[in-house]
Curated annotation (Swiss-Prot):
Annotated TM spans: 8-30, 36-53, 87-104, 106-126
Homology family: Belongs to the p22phox family.
Protein name: Cytochrome b-245 light chain
Modification after translation: Phosphorylation at Thr-147 enhances NADPH oxidase activity by promoting NCF1/p47-phox binding. Ubiquitinated at Lys-149 likely by RNF145.
Cross-link (Glycyl lysine isopeptide (Lys-Gly) (interchain with G-Cter in ubiquitin)): 149
Subunit text: Component of the phagocyte NADPH oxidase core complex/cytochrome b558 complex, composed of CYBB (heavy chain (beta)) and CYBA (light chain (alpha)). Component of the phagocyte NADPH oxidase complex composed of an obligatory core heterodimer formed by the membrane proteins CYBA and CYBB and the cytosolic regulatory subunits NCF1/p47-phox, NCF2/p67-phox, NCF4/p40-phox and the small GTPase RAC1 or RAC2. Interacts with NCF1 (via SH3 domain). Interacts with SH3PXD2A. Interacts with DUOX1, DUOX2 and TPO. Interacts with NOX4; this interaction mediates superoxide generation.
Modified residues (Phosphoserine): 168
Gene (UniProt): CYBA
Spans within the Extracellular topological domain: 31-35, 105
GO cellular component, one term: endoplasmic reticulum membrane
Length: 195
């Protein structure tokens, strides 16, 4: 059985908790709660968490589905180097960001989600995972003539693959001396010149 990559789960959890923090902060600020400044803090912290967590990290095995527009944010996250690559730093950062938002009822759900994401990042860091960006693969140009193995022998329209089966010996003998209607021969020689 394969090994679980915890960073992938932490990334999804942290991104969702950032959105929950933003929503709770908007409710607290727009509702003019008595401690509305914690709501304003939650909006700022949620936006920061969403920007940090939007680019997915590359998986060790298999392919990673890139988020829409991720390549632009990946360049920004790469600029901070080990601060964004190391999951110990992310675990501590998310835990510290979640504490002030826990003092307000509207943002306590985002706080709990971000604390859970922090715990998952800590588990990923203990298991030796780190964030690596998804780099675009260089496109390989197909070489001209390298993809064509052998040109078709029958002129179009060609029959389907089932009908193109090799004839048995009896059918070949009948076709050789039989009535016309067999394969047509092109009277003009065709040459394939690849430049």
């Amino acid at each position: 059985m394969g090994q679980i990559e915890w960073a992938m789960w932490a990334n999804e959890q942290a991104l969702a908790s950032g959105l929950i923090l933003i929503t709770g902060g908007i409710v607290a600020t727009a509702g003019r709660f008595t401690q509305w400044y914690f709501g304003a803090y939650s909006i700022v912290a949620g936006v920061f968490v969403c920007l940090l967590e939007y680019p997915r990290g590359k998986r060790k095995k298999g392919s990673t589905m890139e988020r829409w527009g991720q390549k632009y944010m990946t360049a920004v996250v790469k600029l901070f180097g080990p601060f964004t690559r190391n999951y110990y730093v992310r675990a501590v950062l998310h835990l510290l960001l979640s504490v002030p938002a826990g003092f307000l009822l509207a943002t306590i759900l985002g706080t709990a989600c971000l604390a859970i994401a922090s715990g998952i990042y800590l588990l990923a860091a203990v298991r030796g995972e780190q964030w690596t960006p998804i780099e675009p693969k260089p496109r390989e140009r197909p070489q001209i003539g390298g993809t064509i193995k052998q040109p078709p022998s029958n002129p179009p329209p060609r029959p389907p693959a089932e009908a193109r089966k090799k004839p048995s010996e009896e059918e070949a003998a009948v076709a050789a001396g039989g009535p016309p209607g067999g394969p047509q021969v092109n009277p003009i020689p065709v040459t394939d010149e690849v430049v």
